């Protein structure tokens, strides 16, 4: 079964269950609505926001918050969509406890048949770090997780760009198995 990508720069980690990519809103309300409706059509029930409070206002023009619009659009279809913010500073990795919290949230959502969308600003650095650590949690080595992430992102229009973006983020992935509470 083929699973559509809702908008540019998104990619399925687990088709129909775990989607990743960039900030789903926009500075244009109509574009934001189109993107959010596309997430709903993909069955997304949980959105995990890795951006920091206020980060979207730093764009020029500033991006609009999306949670209210997402809930309104989901309500029209009778679908319940939750959002949770677990912030990571741009270009950085979270603490091991922070990454465990993010991965536990993803695991719970998938286990309860609630497809999840994980995003940061551009969908490469923080999002790539989370996806690669998720793959390590599933049994891949850090380097294997990074290679698999590269393959998963090939369908994204920015898939040719490095993800995670920084060497520190990539090193975090390589070390993740030592910090994952599932392995301790």
Locate the predicted segments by residue.
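Cys-dependent protein tyrosine phosphatase-like superfamily
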Residues: 1-117, 122, 130-184
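Ser/Thr-glycine-rich phosphate-binding loops at phosphate-binding pockets of nucleotides
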Residues: 127
